[in-house]
Regions:
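A structural signal for small-residue-enriched, beta-sheet-centric alpha/beta enzyme cores
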Residues: 1-88, 92, 98-403
Length: 403
């Protein structure tokens, strides 16, 4: 397996584009994105667990109930959530795009992201769709820009892998900077692949993957109303269709996880106002479920995130987060270390503090990528979670979000 360029356009038969249609006031910001497969594709998606859901999620869930999609359209700048005519607008988006592409509206995935509770005018979207379609090409980067809101950096990746000797490709783009605390999904992620796989197995692969990828990311503890992870697989690589849990399925799942885990790191690193990527690696839990609970609890602790912003090796906040996590843990067996490119330092052993150099700890924690290593020493369960530090700028960004 190797990383390649191309994002969602790396896989055969996929093209993309992003334009400014006028939803956002800033004319330099793209606010409408499209991903298109030249043939119908197997499709699957997972959705936010927030009880308040954006209208596009309802429409998308209905559209891909048959496991088929051919295009994805997404606007940024308006969430189309809590609007009386939200479903109607989302359906209109799919119908307008389908007419321009000459495909079925039922084969369109619809997404929106932005401010909640503001009416979404269909006019700029309708006006922008012809240019969006006309400009289709190898423009994964433009589609990526079109789904961004408070994101500072675009997020895309693609990898190449082999299934039974056939070269396949899978790529993805993501949006996510704030309201990141998934239970799936709380971010927008769009994945494409030319691997031939049934809709049933595609859904199974995605559902399992998010447990250890996007559901293990947190920026601010807020679960969004709108976001989802979707995937289209058009089969143009020409491999034998993956229809069961076999070696080929395992290979596909590994490639998918390479893409999703990379996007997870990018989302966490680009958290609103963030200066540091935090990666919490838990080993030795009684099982994987307990490991995930501990890792997510630590990465979600506002006190711990603030300590990381200040490069303060306050390991007590780690133990505190472990203690209230609800995981089955022997706190007297817990070890904690911090690691970065500047080295590694142990700050806690068997649930108690150990002598360490505060100066060395600060040097380690001043880096932009920090690993929190937690050994529970109670079993074979492992997990990793991603997050970021909590800074002054997070409050500034969200205090001014609607302005």
């Amino acid at each position: 397996m190797k990383q390649i360029t191309g994002g969602v356009c790396a896989a055969k038969g996929f093209s993309a584009n992003g334009v400014h249609c006028g939803i956002r006031k800033n004319k330099t910001k793209r606010d409408l994105a499209l991903i298109y497969s030249r043939i119908p594709a197997s499709a699957a998606a997972v959705y936010t667990q927030n009880l308040v859901k954006g209208a596009p999620l309802t429409v998308t869930k209905n559209h891909i109930a048959d496991g088929v999609a051919q295009a994805m359209i997404c606007n940024s700048g308006n969430a189309n959530t809590c609007n009386a005519n939200g479903i109607e607008i989302a359906e209109q988006m799919s119908e307008l795009l389908a007419k321009e592409l000459k495909i079925s509206a039922k084969d369109v995935i619809v997404a929106s992201t932005g401010v909640i509770g503001q009416p979404l005018d269909i006019t700029p979207i309708a006006d922008g769709i012809p240019a969006l379609v006309k400009g289709l090409g190898d423009h994964s980067n433009l589609a990526c820009e079109g789904i961004m809101t408070t994101d500072v950096k675009p997020k895309e990746i693609a990898v190449e892998f082999e299934v039974d000797g056939t070269v396949c490709r899978i790529g993805g783009i993501a949006k996510g900077s704030g309201m990141i605390h998934p239970n799936m999904a709380t971010m927008l992620v769009f994945v494409t692949t030319d691997c031939a796989i049934s809709a049933e197995m595609l859904a199974k692969a995605l559902k399992e993957d998010v447990k250890t990828s996007f559901n293990m990311v947190s920026v601010d503890g807020d679960t969004s109303t709108n976001d989802m992870v979707s995937i289209m697989a058009n089969g143009l690589a020409g491999n034998t269709v993956i229809g069961t849990e076999n070696e080929a399925f395992d290979t596909f799942c590994e490639a998918l996880h390479t893409v999703t885990s990379y996007l997870c790191r990018m989302i966490a690193a680009d958290g609103e106002g963030a200066t540091k990527l935090l990666e919490c690696i838990v080993t030795g839990a009684k099982d994987e479920g307990n490991a995930r609970i501990v890792a997510k609890s630590v990465i979600c602790s506002s006190l711990f995130k603030a300590a990381m912003f200040g490069a303060d090796a306050n390991w007590g906040r780690v133990l505190c987060a472990i203690g209230y996590s609800g995981a089955d843990v022997d706190i007297h067996a817990v070890d904690v270390s911090f690691r970065s490119v500047k080295g590694e330092i142990t700050v806690c052993h068997n649930g108690a503090g150990v002598p360490f150099s505060e100066e060395k700890a600060k040097e380690i924690l001043l880096e932009s990528e920090i690993q929190i290593l937690i050994g529970l020493n109670s079993g074979d369960g492992n997990a990793t979670a991603w997050g970021c530090d909590l800074t002054y700028d997070y409050v500034k960004i969200n205090g001014d979000y609607r302005t």
